[in-house]
C-alpha cells in the first residue's frame, strides 16, 4: 500500500507538471512514458482489492500472486521504455545501450516468478467458491477484470508502434483518441463498481437489501445528473460520469453515517466526532472510502475535459480576444534577464463580464548554455469552476507579433484536490486501528489479578475490522 501511495502521488505530480510547465493546456496525453507509469498502478490497484477476497474468503490466491508478479515486471518494463529510447516520448531519455540488459532482467525475473509459482501451487488453492453473482466477491472480481482489460489496452497501445515496426518496417503510432475510446467506458464501469461494492454483502445479497441500500444513492445520481444538465454540462459521457459521481459519493456518505449513528447513540458524541471515531476504529475500511472519495473528485475533474475551449490569436498591443466569459487584452510586453535565462514576457489584462479582474504574465524563456533551449512559463488563474490558462506561444513568423494561446479548462482543480484526498485516505488506511492499538498496549502489561477476566484480542480486533 505504501508503494501504491507513492505511485499514485508520482502520477498525480507528473500530471500537474505536464499541465503547469509544458504549456499545451492538458495534463495527460497518453504519452508512452505516462502510460508506463499507469500500467503497474492498474495491476497494483487490482491487487489491493482482490487481496481482500483472499483475506475474507480465501479466494483468488493464484490471481493475487500473479498480480504481484505482473506489477513488479511492469515497473521494470516502464523503466525499460523510459531509458532505452525504444519509444518516442518527451519524457524518455536518449537512445542508450542499456535496453538489452533490461530485457534480460525481465526474462530472468519472469522465469523466477514462474518457477516460484509452480513450486508453491499446492498452497494457492482457493478455500471457497463464488456463491452468488450479486455479492461483494463478484464486485471485486468484475473490478479486477476491468483493471486487467485496461492494463492490456494501455500496454497494447503503448507498444503498438514497436510491434508495427518489427512486422511491417514502418512505425505506426496510436494517439489519444484510441486510448480515450477504450478507457473512458472502462473508467466509468470502474466508477460504478466503486459505488456498488460497499452496498453488496459477502456471499450473497438479498433483494430486500438491494432495495434498502440502492435507493438513496440512485436518487443522488439522478439529482447530480439534473444539476449538471441545468448547469450546461450535457456531453453524454460527462453527464453519465457526474451521475455516477453522485451515486458513489452518496454510498460513501451512507457508510460513514450508518456507522457514526451507532457510535453516537452509544456514546452521546456528535455525528462528526462519531465519524472520526468510526474511521479510527477501522482505518483500512474507512481509509479506503476516503480514497474512493478522492477518486470521485478526480473523475469530476476528468469529466470537465469534455468542455474545454481554446483560442489562439496573433495580437498587437491593445488587441483583445474573448474566451467564454473572459476578455484578454494585451497591455504591453517586456524582456528580462536573469542569471541563467532571458525571458520575453507578455502583460495581459483579464476582464470578466467587462470588469477588470487581474493581470497575467505568460513568458517565453531561453536558457543559457543549453543551445538556446526555450521553455514556456504558463500563466494560470484557477478556481473550482475552471482554469484560465494562458500561454505565450512565440512570435508570428510573418508579422513578428506575439501569438497568445488561451485555454478555458473546467474543473481541473478538482483533479488535484482528489489526488490530495487519495493520499490522505491511503495514510489513514496505513494507521493502526485505535482499538487494536489498545489491545496491544493491554497485552504488554501484566494482569492485575489472576482471576481477572481475560480479554480476547481476536474478538476485539474483529469488532473494528471490516
Feature names for model-found ranges:
Residues 1-466:
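Solvent-exposed, non-transmembrane regions of integral membrane proteins
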Amino acid at each position: 500500500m505504501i508503494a501504491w501511495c507513492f505511485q499514485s502521488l508520482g502520477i498525480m505530480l507528473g500530471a500537474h507538471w505536464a499541465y503547469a510547465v509544458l504549456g499545451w493546456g492538458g495534463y495527460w496525453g497518453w504519452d508512452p512514458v505516462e502510460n508506463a507509469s499507469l500500467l503497474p498502478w492498474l495491476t497494483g490497484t487490482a491487487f489491493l482489492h482482490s487481496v481482500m477476497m483472499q483475506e475474507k474468503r480465501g479466494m483468488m490466491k493464484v490471481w493475487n500472486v500473479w498480480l504481484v508478479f505482473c506489477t513488479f515486471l511492469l515497473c521494470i518494463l516502464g523503466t525499460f521504455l523510459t531509458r532505452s529510447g525504444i519509444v518516442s516520448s518527451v519524457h524518455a531519455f536518449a537512445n542508450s545501450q542499456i535496453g538489452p540488459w533490461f530485457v534480460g532482467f525481465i526474462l530472468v525475473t519472469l522465469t523466477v516468478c514462474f518457477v516460484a509459482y509452480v513450486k508453491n501451487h499446492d498452497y494457492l488453492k482457493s478455500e471457497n467458491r463464488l456463491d452468488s453473482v450479486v455479492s461483494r466477491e463478484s464486485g471485486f472480481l468484475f473490478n479486477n477484470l476491468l483493471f486487467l482489460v485496461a492494463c492490456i489496452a494501455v500496454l497494447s497501445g503503448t507498444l503498438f508502434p514497436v510491434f508495427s515496426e518489427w512486422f511491417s518496417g514502418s512505425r505506426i503510432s496510436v494517439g489519444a483518441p484510441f486510448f480515450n475510446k477504450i478507457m473512458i467506458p472502462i473508467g466509468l464501469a470502474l466508477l460504478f463498481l466503486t459505488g456498488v461494492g460497499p452496498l453488496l454483502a459477502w456471499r450473497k445479497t438479498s433483494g430486500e437489501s438491494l432495495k434498502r441500500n440502492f435507493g438513496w444513492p440512485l436518487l443522488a445520481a439522478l439529482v447530480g445528473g439534473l444539476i449538471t444538465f441545468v448547469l450546461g454540462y450535457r456531453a453524454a459521457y460527462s453527464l453519465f460520469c457526474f451521475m455516477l459521481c453522485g451515486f458513489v459519493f452518496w454510498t460513501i456518505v451512507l457508510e460513514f453515517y450508518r456507522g457514526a449513528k451507532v457510535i453516537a447513540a452509544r456514546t452521546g458524541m456528535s455525528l462528526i466526532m462519531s465519524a472520526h471515531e468510526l474511521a479510527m476504529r477501522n482505518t483500512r475500511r474507512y481509509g479506503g472510502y476516503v480514497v474512493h472519495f478522492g477518486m470521485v473528485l478526480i473523475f469530476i475533474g476528468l469529466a470537465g475535459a469534455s468542455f474545454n475551449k481554446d483560442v489562439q490569436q496573433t495580437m498587437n498591443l491593445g488587441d483583445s480576444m474573448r474566451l467564454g466569459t473572459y476578455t484578454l487584452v494585451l497591455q504591453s510586453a517586456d524582456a528580462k534577464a536573469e542569471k541563467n535565462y532571458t525571458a520575453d514576457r507578455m502583460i495581459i489584462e483579464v476582464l470578466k463580464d467587462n470588469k477588470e479582474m487581474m493581470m497575467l504574465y505568460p513568458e517565453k524563456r531561453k536558457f543559457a548554455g543549453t543551445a538556446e533551449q526555450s521553455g514556456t512559463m504558463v500563466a494560470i488563474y484557477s478556481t473550482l469552476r475552471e482554469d484560465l490558462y494562458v500561454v505565450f506561444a512565440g512570435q508570428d513568423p510573418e508579422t513578428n507579433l506575439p501569438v497568445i494561446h488561451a485555454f478555458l479548462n473546467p474543473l481541473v482543480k478538482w483533479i488535484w484536490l482528489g489526488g490530495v484526498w487519495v493520499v490522505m485516505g491511503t495514510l489513514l488506511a496505513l494507521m493502526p486501528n485505535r482499538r487494536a492499538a489498545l489491545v496491544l498496549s493491554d497485552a504488554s502489561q501484566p494482569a492485575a489479578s489472576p482471576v481477572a477476566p481475560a480479554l480476547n484480542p481476536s474478538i476485539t480486533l474483529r469488532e473494528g475490522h471490516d
